[in-house]
């Protein structure tokens, strides 16, 4: 009998934001998989968050999955195919595998492509929702993301700056390396912005105006522009 693969959102950084279901399933799983950026690494941000909520996780069988932060499609495909083979072999043994991911698994999650490969080979994924970084950031700032009949647009960096002109509220994610451009575009539109870097983590930083946001703000920075 085939095992089961779960993709579990561990939230943005604060282990207390992990859901009861996430904690339960992690405890029940035989193998804990998680993405790493460096092939030499043996842990990750997602794993360290989960370990705070489930200390015994380190005693389980661990499977670091190399997931380089690159845009080359061939490299990405090769790493996903290798990971799919590793996970498939475990599922064929009847094991339960938990794949940990930051935030929620249905928002900009690298596992999506891996899940497709597994599905093509007859392995279906069960997803466990987690708190998104932008919801957690809004809570830390004490401001609603959207209210009443406002629309909400989520942008990965500023790949299409014209989207900032759309009516309603906006959330800007993954802007590392483009922060100066993002701020210039917001200023050109007459918008101020708040932001949270590394929300819920030990090195969390809160910026309450666009002038406070540094150009070198990290990858895990969520920007919430003001105005409509």
Positions of PLM-derived features:
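Class I S-adenosyl-L-methionine
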Residues: 1-15, 20-123, 211-214, 221-222, ...
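A contiguous loop/helix-start segment that scaffolds small-molecule binding in enzyme catalytic cores
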Residues: 5, 36, 164-228
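Structural signal for conserved beta-strand scaffold positions within catalytic alpha/beta enzyme cores
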Residues: 34, 61-66, 127, 147, ...
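Short gly/pro/ser/thr-enriched loop/turn and capping motifs at secondary-structure boundaries
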Residues: 39-41, 132-135, 201-203
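A short acidic, often aromatic-flanked loop/helix-cap motif at beta-alpha or helix-coil junctions
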Residues: 67-73, 160-162, 201-204
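Short, surface-exposed amphipathic charged segments that create phosphate/polyanion-binding patches used
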Residues: 75-83, 140-143, 165-169, 207-212
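A short, acidic, amphipathic alpha-helical segment used as a generic capping/interface helix at domain edges
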Residues: 86-88, 156-164, 177-181
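Class I SAM-dependent methyltransferase SAM-binding "motif I" and its flanking Rossmann-like core
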Residues: 106-166, 214
């Amino acid at each position: 009998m085939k095992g089961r693969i779960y993709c579990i959102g561990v939230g943005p950084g604060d282990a207390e934001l992990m859901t009861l279901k996430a904690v339960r399933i992690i405890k029940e799983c035989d193998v804990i998989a998680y993405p790493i950026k460096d092939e030499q690494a043996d842990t990750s941000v997602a794993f360290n968050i989960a370990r705070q909520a489930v200390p015994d996780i380190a005693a389980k069988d661990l499977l670091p999955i190399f997931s380089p932060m690159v845009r080359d499609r061939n490299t990405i495909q090769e790493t996903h195919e290798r990971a799919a083979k590793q996970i498939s072999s475990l599922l064929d043994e009847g094991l339960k595998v938990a794949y940990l991911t930051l935030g929620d698994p249905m928002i900009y999650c690298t596992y999506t492509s891996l899940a497709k490969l597994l599905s093509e080979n007859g392995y279906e994924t069960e997803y466990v929702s987690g708190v998104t970084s932008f919801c957690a950031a809004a809570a830390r700032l004490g401001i609603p993301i959207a209210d009443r009949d406002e629309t909400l647009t989520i942008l990965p960096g500023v790949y299409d700056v014209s989207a900032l002109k759309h009516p309603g509220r906006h959330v800007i994610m993954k802007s590392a390396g483009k922060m100066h451009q993002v701020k210039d575009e917001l200023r050109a539109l007459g918008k101020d912005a708040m932001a949270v870097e590394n929300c819920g983590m030990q090195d969390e930083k809160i910026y309450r105006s666009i002038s406070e946001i540094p150009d070198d703000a990290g990858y895990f920075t969520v920007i919430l522009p003001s105005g409509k």
